[in-house]
Amino acid sequence: MVGILLRVLAIVVVLFALAVIAGPFLISSEPREGLASNTEAAMAESRFVRIPFAGTAGLAVHYLEPPTDAPSWATPFLLLHGFTFNAWTWQPALDAFAARGRVVAYDQVPYGLSAKPARADWDGPNPFSKEAAITQLFAVMDALDLERAVLVGNSSGGTLALEAALARPGRVEALILVAPWVYVTRPTLPATVASLPQMRRLSLLIARKLGENGPLLDLSYADASAITDGRRERFAIHARVAGWDLAWGELLSLSLSTPVTVSEHLVQVQVPVLVVTGEMDRVVPVDDSRRVAGQLPDASFVVIPGCGHVPQEECPDQFARVVGDWLDARRIGASGR
């Protein structure tokens, strides 16, 4: 009897191992069909610029830029969205920034309507790496004639803003970090493991779930019932563009082996910083944002009551007041009053 049980157990173990090894190969790696180009999916307010990137023929970057009556000398603002979001996360706040200077919100590659390069599209650095995101940020600034700017980053966009300020402080006037994703507790895998075919297929599956179902949008609001149909439409606009799922899968696969280490360098940030968070943030704990502000040499910290992870969307009036008061106190840009 014991021998039979051991044989059955051995068979179960073997079947489980085969499922783990072979199961991910059941996930299709073919891109979603019947989708449009980024320009075909564009909205009336959409703009595009092509930036150089090593090993490619250039990358198309989608951005939003409202008109401004601010004086030409006013410092411009460059707005950086978070993971799975896009430039439209800043739409409710664009006019408030435009009252103080030129403002540009762009889709980081491969989000929104920006380029979604497939592996065959590049022969050089990975366009989805942290280093690539920094390079692309400054390439956008160059292409749009932004010599120096205030970087405004939400969530992982705040991480990118910090990395950019550390890399090229001479081009950053100040930072506004909205619930920055700095103290990350997620595990990372060795590159050899993350690059296994099975892991790449699983990354693709997760990317599709995140991109098609949009769970992070609801999680980012204190009150998800406030999310309009129009907001959901723009959040998911990437899913209209051919190759979006493969590009997101590539980014997610790479992130599995890329630790977030910017917290180790906060004391080196040389510019003034405003850290803002929502009182009811369920993505980045309020204490994490407070801790970021405490580690920076020159930072202010504000909590906006009743808001979640994206106060610029959910509480735009309060957000604009907090940011405006800080900019006025620091005498950065033109006054919005």
Where are these predicted regions, by residue range?
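Conserved HGGG/HGGXW glycine-rich cap/lid loop of the alpha/beta-hydrolase fold
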Residues: 66-116
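Alpha/beta-hydrolase fold catalytic core
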Residues: 1-75, 100-101, 128, 146-147, ...
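Conserved alpha/beta-hydrolase catalytic His-Asp/Glu region
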Residues: 27-28, 187-191, 206-265
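Gly/Ala-rich beta-loop-alpha elbow adjacent to hydrolase catalytic centers
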Residues: 153, 157, 161
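Short beta-strand/loop motif that positions the catalytic acidic residue
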Residues: 269, 275-277, 281
